[in-house]
């Protein structure tokens, strides 16, 4: 089979000169199998030394032309004239025959020109080069793909502006579209690309493609010469066409100074120093206005302010000074309620000044009229009555406070102890003349206070009325004035309303009378245990020693069961050891002191009086009272 094909090919090659046209030769060559071409290298359609297509272009999408080389003519072997054949494919297969180039002259040497009659834009074309009946090059394309417009024409430039430094300038470059391109009707839409460079440079600077025929060029150096060129292409298809002619741009010198290098403004340094300066200014402002800014951000807390008080005292915490200032101002003093259960002081009725000048204090004390108008030595009982007699601790506390308040002096303490014992005897004497002789004087005078350890101790105030009655009977009897002990000094006033007196003169007759009636002293034991909760030493000495002469056990026993009674342990032991203590050595008479001065004014009606200093009598001080229970008292007493 291969042999017959080889023979047929040789026959055709030998008879190629007999064919009338080159088209048949080309057709035969194209139909020749590849195997024959490999056997005969001269039949190859594309050789390194054979003609080739260089380009095919359509400047306006209406006509096109193709160009090729003729290198084969310069070779050792001459293949004959070069011919171009073309065909148009209407379908998938090439059904039409090849046709030769219609014009070899219009487009120039080694070219083929297709006018508008042979041009179809949307129909593909295939072209080939043949020499001596053989195909040397072949190519297929469409007219729209080979569009390359002609270069723009009429390039020029104008100066836009020059920089302030005179170093740079801006220009505007203008041109016109190719004359054969139908731009007005929109048959072609062209894109333009501008390139420029200095004359001595080799690399062109390209600008972005534009659709207009003018573009500004910025920052061109003065005293430099530039080259500018422009080219165009079909938008969205095709390739750029040829560049236009080069436009030379020379900018004149605008200033006397020439600058060979660019002057770059130090924007970075300016920004850095600007930020640093603003930061410094901000810190200075904050430092100078820090107090005001602090008040705006953190408002101050209002300080405590009280009218008349320095706020610094409140800040420093000096509460004592604040309390002192508050105590001075009347508006800040606390209000005492009228229903207070505690009595703060005892109100006294103060006589008029003219009344004091009429008679002495001694006469007023001895006057019965004065007793009627001013019972209990002018003391007005302001006790509310709510203080219980069973609260010795509270009364003792108030008594101690009065002693500390300079109520009595150390000189008056022995006189007070002696006077209290004498007062007991005085009451016993008065009891003989009273219809109530079976009651003990000690139970009728609870307002007279026995001093213990240089401190007055309060007694229950239930028998205050009987005490006042006894005192009134004694003072109203003129015959008994020579036998009484005169109490001239009010040493203290207890919160419960009792008055503590100091003796001025001891009467011998009174003391002897007290000793001459031991049976009356023994009778006081019964009422003492029933009415009083406390026994002091002076009472125990007078009542307990005479207990064996009178039988009062039946009277004492019921009262012991009713309540707890406490008496002084030392007084019991002393009285038991000395049964004959009822006989006392009478002392010398002492002058009667008058009210000499007012010691303290506690209120408009409360007074503490001082007496003249008197010589101290020779007597034994009563020892401090201890307390024993009722059972111990029953065991000790005979």
UniProtKB/Swiss-Prot annotation:
UniProt KW keywords: Cell membrane, Disease variant, Disulfide bond, Dwarfism, Endocytosis, Glycoprotein, Membrane, Phosphoprotein, Receptor, Secreted, Signal, Transmembrane, Transmembrane helix, Ubl conjugation
Domain-related comment: The WSXWS motif appears to be necessary for proper protein folding and thereby efficient intracellular transport and cell-surface receptor binding.
Modified residues (Phosphoserine): 341
Sugar-bearing residue positions: 46, 115, 156, 161, 200
Region of interest (Disordered), residue spans: 353-391
Organism: Homo sapiens
Protein name as catalogued: Growth hormone receptor
Pfam families tied to this protein: EpoR_lig-bind (PF09067), fn3 (PF00041), GHBP (PF12772)
Domain Fibronectin type-III: 151-254
Entries under Gene3D superfamilies matching the protein: Immunoglobulins
Outcome after substituting residue 242 to D: Found in a patient with idiopathic short stature; uncertain significance
